[in-house]
Amino acid sequence: SRFWPKSRENTPKQLLKILGKETMIRLTYNRLREIADLDKIFVVVSAKLSKLIHNDIPEIPEENFIIEPSGKNTAPAIGLAALHIFKRDSNAIMGVYPADHLIIGDSKFKNIITNAQKMVEQKPCLITIGIEPTYPATGYGYIQYDSNKKMDVKGVYKVKTFAEKPEKETAEKFIISGEFLWNAGMFVWKAEIILLEIKTFMCELHDSLDSIYDALGTPQYETVLDREWELVHPESIDYGILEKAKNVYTIKADF
């Protein structure tokens, strides 16, 4: 870890006060409170860290902590969150925001997310937030967008391809082309739509999520979750869904 020895398994960087008096996850929470009501903010977390995070952000209702039995990468985690959100509101728009991002300019963030929400209201699509690159970074994945396919909503473009973390020479070519954005791992879509995409492209994960969904709100939930989670294969949302789906768009951000 870049923050070792401060950042360890029991105290990940999300719980470090790297930028002042507040932890990274508290800063993320503060940012989200500008765009969402308190009861609509969820935390996907391991059981080991849930108490630490709840102590740091006691405002978030305990029932909004979605516990992952074990880490299985982003696709299963997002699918599990989508289940809980869809159960509460079948028409809900959900955003996915890592808790360890440094974002300067909360008003810019709010505007970008508002535009992304407009887009997913207009058509059934998946939105990924792309950061305009300032140097040829090799530590990020990249999104290639089609500048000729600009949507009616400000800053939204059709995605051409996703690229894994490149070598420096490739990253330099990406920057020169002007067609690539950093993949920030932030997404906006309707819960229903991402669950449909999981059904299309990740049928085994969908089957497990289906069983978990049926157990939501029952005494059997934790037993079913643990059983099905054992069957789930680790996979990123990028590889599992976004690189395969046809209805993927990006919105350019400069925060």
What kind of region is each of these model predictions?
Residues R2-P5, E9, K17-P98, L102-T114:
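Conserved N-terminal catalytic core of the sugar/cofactor nucleotidyltransferase
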Residues Y29, R33-A36, I57, D89, ...:
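Structural signal for hydrophobic packing residues in well-ordered secondary-structure cores
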Residues E34-A36, K87-D89, G95-V96, M119-Q122, ...:
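Solvent-exposed alpha-helices and their adjacent loops that cap or buttress functional pockets
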Residues V44, G95-P98, T128-E132, A163, ...:
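Short beta-strand segments
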Residues F65, L126-T128, T250:
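Conserved beta-strand scaffold positions in the cores of enzyme catalytic domains, especially
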Residues G71-P76, Y135-A137, K168-T170:
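A short acidic, often aromatic-flanked loop/helix-cap motif at beta-alpha or helix-coil junctions
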Residues L102-A137, Q144:
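Conserved donor-nucleotide/metal-binding helix-loop-beta segment in metal-dependent transferases, i.e.
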Residues Y142-F255:
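Catalytic core of tubulin tyrosine ligase-like
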